[in-house]
């Protein structure tokens, strides 16, 4: 069923290219994983172009758990420890402690405040002292090697930013249904069509990167 629903958004490589173009233009995309994994669709926006309106959309239409996806280098730069020392989550989701911008926010939970926090954490010269802990933005550590190593939304978001030539920081949040349940591919597709957003699967991204690597070699 996944492929039949996805084909309305083009062939696999076209879906990736459409997602890259949208991100370069400051827009968001929806990324779906495998039916046998989380079977969820996530909003993905670039930290670089993130707006308050986009953050508000994630809070309003999603789970409200907005995460900033970063590679190991930025995690070290900000001195962000993992949320737990012994990760027992089903998909080994690598949460860091939560963060807040030290300046420019009030309570930290509004859409504008969360954008301020993300901008502070992803600034070129960002320092640990720029952030308070805990806060209202969840950090996620992407595995080195991206989706070829771990087929998660975290890695997919960072890989997409790199393919788009943007700073390697993705902002993600799970899309939910009006009743609060998780949106599966049929609902993700419906939302994408209504809001003119590209949809791409993590498997599409794996295929795209593998083909690109083969061309280089």
UniProtKB/Swiss-Prot annotation:
Cofactors required: Mg(2+); Mn(2+)
Pfam families reported in the protein's UniProt record: DHBP_synthase
Keyword field: Lyase, Magnesium, Manganese, Metal-binding, Riboflavin biosynthesis
Co-factor binding comment: Binds 2 divalent metal cations per subunit. Magnesium or manganese.
Catalytic activity: D-ribulose 5-phosphate = (2S)-2-hydroxy-3-oxobutyl phosphate + formate + H(+)
Pathway noted in the entry: Cofactor biosynthesis; riboflavin biosynthesis; 2-hydroxy-3-oxobutyl phosphate from D-ribulose 5-phosphate: step 1/1
Residues involved in D-ribulose 5-phosphate binding: 37-38, 42, 150-154, 174
Binding annotation for Mg(2+) 2: 38, 153
EC number: 4.1.99.12
Gene Ontology terms: biological process: riboflavin biosynthetic process
Molecular function in Gene Ontology: 3,4-dihydroxy-2-butanone-4-phosphate synthase activity; magnesium ion binding; manganese ion binding
Example of a GO cellular component annotation carried by this entry: cytosol
Gene3D superfamilies for this protein: DHBP synthase
Site keyed Essential for catalytic activity: positions: 136, 174
Binding residues for Mg(2+) 1: 38
HAMAP family: RibB
Protein family per UniProt: Belongs to the DHBP synthase family.
Assembly: Homodimer.
Its biological purpose: Catalyzes the conversion of D-ribulose 5-phosphate to formate and 3,4-dihydroxy-2-butanone 4-phosphate.
Record protein name field: 3,4-dihydroxy-2-butanone 4-phosphate synthase
Annotated organism of origin: Pseudoalteromonas translucida (strain TAC 125)
